[in-house]
């Protein structure tokens, strides 16, 4: 299994990576089934979703369950398909034509269901997973509190064991709970003797209630409510994982959520580019389609480039997880693998959400004044996608996680930055190698390798200057994370170009040879 973050230490293109062109016919069929479901059953009622028509969203999710879209990652033994992350990625990508539905769908299949997949006991899995896979039960995830947003461990919800040791009594309030208005099952985090613990709480438990829907900037049709816990009696059998180890569940569930968010951003970005490309060829100004003008074509090109890199990044990460999970002996080992790829998960989340935000902004610009009006779908996309930079930990927090995690691993020796720093210092004196100078795209392989060295060198200089206090230098850490994030995206796109057999790529090769 490849170490998380080790892409910084490897030569670009030295190892094969999973690319979208390797999707199997079955995986492509899953994507097509998802796309057809959303286009035929969700998009036609998008105005009703936006108006928050009562009971519509849970009805659509249950229909998705009937079609089989909720069961991809649920084990076959629990009524699911037992598929991997690549399959889940293509499902997530194709669920994005309606923003509010996508949020509800991803919440249920991701942070709503997967905690039981990874940490549930056999009894918990048998009790809940079949119902979650079919849509009979719908799920939500309750971590955030009024005073515990980015600082999730500051939560004040508590759980006390009853004298007979049969129940925990939960008290507290969670906020911004996606799917909270209709969910049947919540993964709730509360402290037992000051230590974070996860619980499976059914909405039917006495003392569980929800507050009014939040009035949001976007994703109007998704449910976002406070969850109120008043002396809720939860059986000890509903403790998820170990008492006092809830932080592990919370953070690793967010790692899964970050990857899924990145996958969703791929689909939404594709949708926006398709809409915009169609519009600019239909919109006439100065006697021509505006799509004929260079500045508009440049916008389409910039969006397409960023999409190519994002798609490459997300599928490479999914492939890494599938490869790792295929050799895992049990759920505990899979959890360690999620933690191993925490850096890649944060990169997928930050890069994905910011690419989508860029493309949604360019879509508005290409539509001109019409893009600013709610008669055009790009206006809704612009509002809906803004929350992605807040979901699953803000992009600022994730930037700190990217560089902070890599520094911790370098300090502990998990990643051998010291040897690489020595190599870099030597190269500064003798010169940097040009191993691919004569190869097609070889120059870019060398450039990416140089940027990787730059990121490691900046980390080393930062540690030398600030020592242990480097974790307080947020501006530096964020800048390093941006270098790492962009480098990872460029490398993934480059590896895809080198591995793939794209007709356009082959044409470019022929043209280049003829010019010689």
Which positions does each model-derived feature cover?
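Amphipathic, small/basic residue-rich leader segments at the start of a protein or domain
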Residues: 1-106, 123-127, 131-138, 150, ...
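Alpha-helix capping/hinge segments and adjacent helical runs
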Residues: 2-4, 40, 68, 76, ...
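Glycine-rich beta->alpha junctions and the first turn(s) of the following alpha-helix
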Residues: 20-23, 29-30, 97, 209-311, ...
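N-terminal glycine-rich flavin-associated loop
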Residues: 42, 104-123, 149-152, 161-164
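C-terminal helix-coil-helix/basic helical segment that borders enzyme active sites and/or dimer interfaces
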Residues: 46-51, 308-351, 364-367, 464-467, ...
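A gly/ser-rich beta-alpha-beta helix-loop segment of oxidoreductase catalytic cores
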Residues: 138-161
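Glycine-rich phosphate/pyrophosphate-binding beta-alpha loops
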Residues: 148, 175-181, 256, 387-392
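A short core secondary-structure module
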Residues: 166-210
């Amino acid at each position: 299994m490849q170490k998380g973050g080790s892409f910084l230490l490897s030569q670009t293109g030295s190892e094969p990576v999973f690319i979208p062109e390797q999707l199997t016919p079955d995986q492509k069929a899953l994507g097509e089934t998802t796309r057809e479901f959303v286009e035929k059953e969700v998009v036609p009622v998008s105005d009703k979703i936006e108006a928050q028509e009562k009971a519509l969203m849970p009805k659509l999710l249950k229909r998705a369950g009937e079609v089989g879209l909720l069961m991809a990652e649920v084990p076959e033994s629990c009524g699911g398909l037992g598929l991997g992350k690549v399959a889940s990625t293509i499902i997530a990508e194709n669920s994005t034509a309606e923003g509010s539905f996508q949020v509800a769908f991803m919440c249920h299949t991701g942070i709503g269901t997967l905690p039981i997949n990874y940490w549930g006991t056999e009894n918990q899995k048998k009790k809940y997973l079949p119902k979650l896979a079919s849509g009979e039960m719908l799920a939500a995830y309750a971590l955030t509190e009024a005073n515990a947003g980015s600082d999730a461990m500051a939560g004040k919800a508590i759980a006390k064991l009853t004298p007979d040791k049969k129940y925990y009594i939960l008290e507290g309030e969670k906020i911004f709970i996606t799917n909270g208005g209709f969910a049947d099952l919540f993964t709730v985090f509360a402290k037992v003797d000051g230590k974070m613990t996860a619980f499976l709480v059914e909405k039917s438990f006495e003392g569980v209630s929800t507050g009014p829907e939040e009035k949001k900037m976007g994703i109007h049709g998704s449910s976002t409510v406070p969850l109120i816990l008043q002396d809720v009696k939860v059986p000890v059998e509903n403790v998820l994982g170990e008492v006092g180890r809830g932080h592990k569940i919370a953070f690793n569930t967010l790692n899964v959520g970050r990857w899924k968010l990145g996958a969703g951003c791929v689909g939404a970005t594709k949708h926006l580019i398709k809409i915009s490309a169609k519009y600019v060829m239909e919109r006439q100004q100065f006697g021509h389609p505006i799509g004929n003008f260079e500045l508009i074509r440049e916008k389409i090109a910039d969006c397409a480039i960023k999409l190519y890199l994002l798609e490459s990044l997300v599928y490479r990460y999914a492939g890494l997880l599938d490869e790792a999970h295929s050799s895992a002996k049990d759920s505990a080992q899979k959890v360690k693998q999620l933690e191993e790829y925490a850096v890649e998960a944060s990169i997928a989340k930050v890069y994905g959400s910011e690419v989508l935000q860029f493309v949604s902004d360019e879509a508005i610009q290409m539509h001109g004044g019409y893009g600013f009006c709610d008669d055009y779908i790009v206006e809704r996309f612009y509002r809906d996608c803004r929350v992605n930079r807040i979901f699953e930990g803000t992009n600022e927090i994730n930037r700190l996680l990217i560089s902070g995690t890599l520094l911790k691993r370098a300090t502990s020796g998990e990643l051998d930055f010291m040897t690489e720093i020595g190599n870099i210092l030597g190269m500064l004196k003798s010169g940097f190698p040009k191993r691919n100078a004569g190869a097609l795209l070889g120059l870019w392989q060398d450039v990416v390798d140089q940027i990787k060295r730059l990121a490691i060198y900046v980390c080393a200089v930062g540690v030398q200057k600030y020592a242990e206090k480097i974790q307080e230098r947020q501006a530096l850490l964020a800048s390093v994370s941006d270098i790492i994030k962009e480098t990872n995206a460029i490398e993934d796109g480059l590896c895809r170009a080198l591995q793939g057999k794209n007709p356009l790529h082959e044409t470019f090769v022929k043209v280049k040879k003829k010019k010689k």
